[in-house]
Amino acid sequence: MMSYYMDTTIGSTGPYPLARPGVMQGASSCCEDPWMPCRLQSACCPPRSCCPPWDEAAIQEVPTGLEHYSTDMECADVPLLTPSSKEMMSQALKATFSGFAKEQQRLGIPKDPQQWTETHVRDWVMWAVNEFSLKGVDFQKFCMNGAALCALGKECFLELAPDFVGDILWEHLEILQKEEAKPYPANGVNAAYPESRYTSDYFISYGIEHAQCVPPSEFSEPSFITESYQTLHPISSEELLSLKYENDYPSVILRDPVQTDSLQTDYFTIKQEVVTPDNMCMGRASRGKLGGQDSFESIESYDSCDRLTQSWSSQSSFQSLQRVPSYDSFDSEDYPAALPNHKPKGTFKDYVRDRADMNKDKPVIPAAALAGYTGSGPIQLWQFLLELLTDKSCQSFISWTGDGWEFKLSDPDEVARRWGKRKNKPKMNYEKLSRGLRYYYDKNIIHKTAGKRYVYRFVCDLQSLLGYTPEELHAMLDVKPDADE
């Protein structure tokens, strides 16, 4: 119900929302009150506050129209990042973060998110809603300027953002800030690309005969790569050597030998090696932090990822170590190695088969190890399910049915609880988890088995990715066919 009264400051009438009954001054917990009114030109919360405080004078502010949006945070068809075929992925990757650059140019949004007004923040959220087909987003939760938005911190931001897409939006915000903050390389290539940012986030394709890297324009046309990637532009090996790269997530950095002291990363420390046109050696990674969390989120599931990560980093390609995997990155032919004309042999099974640090009491397919192998960065839901399904201690609440890649959630609430614990989302439940599973339906990753409750089946080509047949896994886990089914 809206209340109508005269605003004496502007001399016109209009619908203004009344204060929400029962809201107390100074909410006890940040990011929990979505009923905060918007201000068009000034920040409604201090820079270090999660959400703007409620005050009586706020009802006198000019309405923005955002109060008419639903406050339902229901999320549907959120584009999670999953393995799939090249054909499906080439279509899905057309909707990229690079599309926001065009919006920035069209709407005059500053490149630095710190300079955004409330209107700019609203435009960014609207772009995300359209880009990822989000539904029921509560715009009032984002009534703040850019400085306040950036000051929220990841955990507080995730409380505001819709389920399953918060990590993506936060990374986009971080990328925008880092691109604005990065200095241009002090070399001759800078003149050729005066408006470029040289980060290996964009360096996703590598070959000795056709070496490519990405000096993306601020407003380049969208390409076929998702997330922060831009259109590839071929350059010569001489130009490649003069570029400086700073990788924000994976364990690979190409550095300008003259300016190594100026490069820093929050996630990995790198041992620099010589880069030549004929042999592009990769750095050796040590365990780091990603956004304040364990880099592979593997404390619970796998204790030996330090050694595995270090081993894989010397064999995986730039593409396979990207934080956000492309759909075609799960094909073995897309894993060029660091050495010229050499590709990693075998599958995930081959990487871990003979490793002494593989504990028999641990899952056959640790999610953290699989994430490191595929280069997906944060553990994805499908990887987490595979970890549980290959852990004998979890068979009481999730297990294979014995029919190929079909599995059953015997206790879906426990599966959701563990997923929430792994992703630091204590409010996770099966309803939210099932929305993630439903996204996999359209992408032909996982299908729901008709007529069977809580029974699903992997329909993608897991055997090629993992190197295991379902029968092999069943034998290793002592799985017996489910007679009841």
UniProtKB/Swiss-Prot annotation:
Stretches for region Helix HI-2: 367-374
Residue segments, region Activation domain: 174-287
Residue ranges of the region described as Helix H5: 470-476
Activity regulation, free text: Autoinhibited by a module composed of four alpha helices (HI-1, HI-2, H4, and H5) that flank the DNA-binding ETS domain, reducing the affinity for DNA.
An annotated GO cellular component: nucleus
Compartments where found: Nucleus; Cytoplasm
Region of interest called Helix H4, as start-end residue ranges on this chain: 462-466
Molecular function as annotated in GO: DNA-binding transcription factor activity, RNA polymerase II-specific; sequence-specific DNA binding
Main location: nucleus
Keywords: Cytoplasm, DNA-binding, Nucleus, Proto-oncogene, Transcription, Transcription regulation
Cited SMART domains: ETS, SAM_PNT
Annotation: DNA-binding region: 379-459
InterPro entries, A to Z: Ets1_N_flank, Ets_dom, ETS_fam, Pointed_dom, SAM/pointed_sf, SAM_PNT-ETS-1, Transform_prot_C-ets, WH-like_DNA-bd_sf
One Gene Ontology biological process: positive regulation of endothelial cell migration
Region (Helix HI-1): 348-356
PNT domain segment(s): 95-180
Record function comment: Transcription factor. Directly controls the expression of cytokine and chemokine genes in a wide variety of different cellular contexts.
Family: Belongs to the ETS family.
Subunit annotation: Binds DNA as a homodimer; homodimerization is required for transcription activation.
Protein name stated in the entry: Transforming protein p68/c-ets-1
Source organism per UniProt: Gallus gallus
